Amino acid sequence: MSSLPALDQFFTLYHQAYSDKLGESPRYFPLGEASPCVLECDQEKVDASPERSVQWQAVKRDSQGPFDNIEHALSITLHPSIQAFYGRYFAAPLMFESEFGEGELLQPWNQQDFEYLQQNLIGHLMMKQKLKQPATWFIGVLGEGDEMLVVENETGSVWIEIPGEQPHRQLAASLEDFIASLRPRVCPPQKPVEAPMPETDHPGIWQRLKTMWRHLIAKR
C-alpha cells in the first residue's frame, strides 16, 4: 500500500466502473507512445495503428519515481503526497465527477512523460517564485481546463488555482481526502488535437500548463 491509499482505491474503482458500464477497460489515444499500461491485446495498435485508441490498465511502479532532482534544483522539500501521486503509477489521465464539477487528474503515461512532467513542475514553481506566491503543484484541471487543481506544498491541501493567480478555493485538507471524494467518470476517449503554440523564451504558467497537457495527453 502506498502513502496515498485513496489513489490505489480510485484506480480500482475506475477500472471497475468501466468494466461494469462498457464491458472493457478504459481507452486512451497514445498516438504511437508506448507504455506498460497498454493491455497485451492492444499492444500492436500502438505502432501499427497509432491513430486508434487502446485499452489500458494502471501499472504500479516497482519503486516510486524519484523527485530529488526537483528538490535539489529548487532547494525545496516536496510535500510527500505529491511524490506518491506522481511517482507510484504509470497511467492515462483519470476522468472524474465531484460535487465541485468534472475534471481530469494527470498521470504519467510512461517514463518519458514522468521526466517531462518533472520539468514542468520545476517551471511552474519557478514562476510561482517569480510572482512571490506560495509553492503549489498542479495535479489536474477542472471543466474545460481554465482552472487548475493544485496541492499547496506547505500544507498538502488541495485548491483551485487560475494560472498566474493565488489559489482561491480550498477543496480538501489533503490530497488523500480530495481523491477519496471523487467518483470515476466513464466516458469515451477523446482524440487529442494539438493547437500550435508560439515559442517564447519565458513561457508563463498557462503556456507551461498547455505544453504539459500537449505532451502528456496530446503527445508529441
UniProtKB/Swiss-Prot annotation:
The keyword Transcription does not apply. Keywords: Cell inner membrane, Cell membrane, Membrane. It is found in: Cell inner membrane. It is a peripheral membrane protein. Its main location: membrane. It comes from the Bacteria. GO terms for cellular component: cytoplasmic side of plasma membrane. InterPro entries: Syd, Syd_sf. HAMAP family: Syd. Interacts with the SecY protein in vivo. May bind preferentially to an uncomplexed state of SecY, thus functioning either as a chelating agent for excess SecY in the cell or as a regulatory factor that negatively controls the translocase function. Belongs to the Syd family. This is Protein Syd. It comes from Shewanella loihica (strain ATCC BAA-1088 / PV-4). The gene is syd.
